[in-house]
Amino acid sequence: MRGAVPIVFVVDDDDLVREWLELLIQSAGCRAETFASAEEFLARPRVLSPSCLVLEVKLPHLNGLDLQERIAADRVDMPIIFITGDADIPTIVRAMKAGAAEFLTKPFDADVLLNAIREAVDRSECVLRQEAKMRSLRNRYASLTAREREVMDLVVTGELNKQVGGELGISEITVKAHRGKMMRKMQAGSLIELVNMAAILRPASVPNA
């Protein structure tokens, strides 16, 4: 892994299991944070580092499946690996349909869990990279002036500078100036690249996007 050390969160109400998992995770070069309940885990602020969650299904109060449902919307960058000593088919199906990365039944082989953790962390890193790219794109778009946004909106539909000028009531030379600044701010190397950016930002505004 490059950059930040991956964090593996563990939620299990069994003290011995938490201690064993913490040692195992640390032996793989990851940072481990353990919690005895879902409520303890939910009190922990979200991290912006590659991470995954090793989660016991049967927990007191808020169980593992309910926790999965609670964090599904705002922690898509944190894959979940379920572990349990007693699993039934409906439980496994529900967990996997909701996006679980893996479902392991205790006792499980340490290497199997470590492989699942590596895959989950890689997936988390990929999601975080995509989120960072999206934030960067939105920030670049936010830096545009109102006029530059108007020019961009028309350019990505295929209009020529002269047509853009006619619609906005400005000269073709002025359109070229705004277009040049807009392209630089958006870091777009070509019209096709700009169209792709617009499709990501506002899909409905780009024909056939």
Label each PLM-derived region with a short phrase.
Residues 1-9, 15, 22, 37, ...:
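Non-catalytic signal-transmission and effector/linker regions of two-component phosphorelay proteins
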Residues 34-52:
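Acidic, metal-coordinating helix/loop segments flanking the phosphotransfer/catalytic sites
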Residues 183-209:
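Basic, Lys/Arg-enriched C-terminal extension of HTH/homeodomain DNA-binding domains
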Residues 36-37, 63-66:
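Acidic catalytic/metal-coordinating carboxylates
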Residues 88-90, 104, 108-117, 167:
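C-terminal output helix
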Residues 56, 84:
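Active-site residues of response regulator receiver
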